[in-house]
Swiss-Prot record:
Function, as annotated: Increases the formation of ribosomal termination complexes and stimulates activities of RF-1 and RF-2. It binds guanine nucleotides and has strong preference for UGA stop codons. It may interact directly with the ribosome. The stimulation of RF-1 and RF-2 is significantly reduced by GTP and GDP, but not by GMP.
Gene responsible for this protein: prfC
Positions of the tr-type G domain: 8-268
GO molecular function: GTP binding; GTPase activity; translation release factor activity, codon nonspecific; translation release factor activity, codon specific
Pfam families referenced in this protein's UniProt entry, alphabetically: EF-G_D2, GTP_EFTU, RF3_C
An example Gene Ontology biological process: regulation of translational termination
Family membership noted in the UniProt record: Belongs to the TRAFAC class translation factor GTPase superfamily. Classic translation factor GTPase family. PrfC subfamily.
Listed name of the protein: Peptide chain release factor 3
Entry binding sites for GTP: 17-24, 85-89, 139-142
Annotated keywords: Cytoplasm, GTP-binding, Nucleotide-binding, Protein biosynthesis
Amino acid sequence: MNLQEEIKKRRTFAIISHPDAGKTTITEQLLYFGGEIREAGTVKGKKTGNFAKSDWMDIEKQRGISVTSSVMQFDYAGKRVNILDTPGHEDFSEDTYRTLMAVDAAVMVVDSAKGIEAQTKKLFEVVKHRGIPIFTFINKLDRDGREPLDLLEELEEVLGIASYPMNWPIGMGRSFEGLYDLYNQRLELYKGDERFASIEDGDKLFANNPFYEQAKEDIELLTEAGNEFSEEAILKGELTPVFFGSALTNFGVQTFLDSFLAFAPEPHGHKTTDDKVIDPLDKDFSGFVFKIQANMDPRHRDRIAFVRIVSGEFERGMSVNLARTGKSVKLSNVTQFMAESRENVENAVAGDIIGVYDTGTYQVGDTLTVGKNKFEFEPLPTFTPELFMKVSAKNVMKQKSFHKGIEQLVQEGAIQLYTNYQTGEYMLGAVGQLQFEVFKHRMENEYNAEVIMTPMGKKTVRWIKEEDLDERMSSSRNILAKDRFNKPVFLFENDFSLHWFADKYPDIVLEEKM
């Protein structure tokens, strides 16, 4: 098969949701259909604890939440599918936002009993800003939930996106009978031996069933007053196709997968800093690092840089140009993933995600190119932390492990590091409290370095220009520090001290990040 055909087979997407909406379960079921796992929640051929395949880090297994984005790949119906499972916990929005820069579409999982929740809304905004297609899966129909019409209305009002139901529930919870498939014009049956039935048979199958009658009434209303189906609007991210189902009982998931692959886009181009768009079908390889993960295999203390291939083909052993340093790097130890299992990869194409073994060469946001055409992709968003803690090594003899751990976890983007300009003290910045807990856990378990962490509370962070730097401006209410790139930054105690500083030094430009 030629390169263009291979690239056109790729479908790369992320799954987003609020915690506990069933994101990991639906990921499992998709892998099951892809033949990657024998049954959801278990790994093919491994006698291990019955943990979800996509939650691989120790702390995730203990808590049942995804705190890192895992990457999984499978083949299905002539397509090569790359799923990026994103952290559902709001404290990890930073990692999630960066992951959303590496996909061509998003699947939003919604709990039918709870509707649109805070975290879903936040992630949706990022996806919408990118203008990529969004597919909605309303989950947990095996339990009692809210009225389907209410859920659609909320989707449109809260998220501001038009919706089109691809199927419609017949009952819910104990009364759940199945789905009326509007798109394929058939019934999908929840009970009994037959999976599908024709619409004509529905009246006989569900004679005198009030839930079937209600479903037909709802559908009639939607046909008259609802949105029209438009593939063009889906691809622009203006219309979300809505699927109902139950990931836990694996009902409606395959129908969703078939439709998703029919409408989801093939890999798209990415913008460079000089506003050019790199076409996926360009023969020259290019890609960017969207995530760095240390210790995916605790036995080897390794680090993996996750690269989204934007154009061309990767071949094992090829040399690439690292735009940030201008140096040439050989890509020889490269893997592809199935959560914790991985295999060496000989070649991969635009749309694929590869893991490059990293000895400290890469940073999140790095651009890799080949050939004479040198450029950099648009920078990935960075987020200003709000919570801060001072951190130091508990055992002075473990300074080496302490510094190595901090350096690796900071490069991974799991936490942000600031150094007090005057005292040299380390200060950690996070978007949410859980990031500190994960940092402490990983320092102790992966680097054998116990840490002392002292809360500093909330801070307002502003960067200043190097030429404006004057240590005399620093005080207990506005601490002068350096970020991990040695750029000067002030940590203000609150908005009052920020405004006081701005009034006192009107010529100093204070810069805010995302």
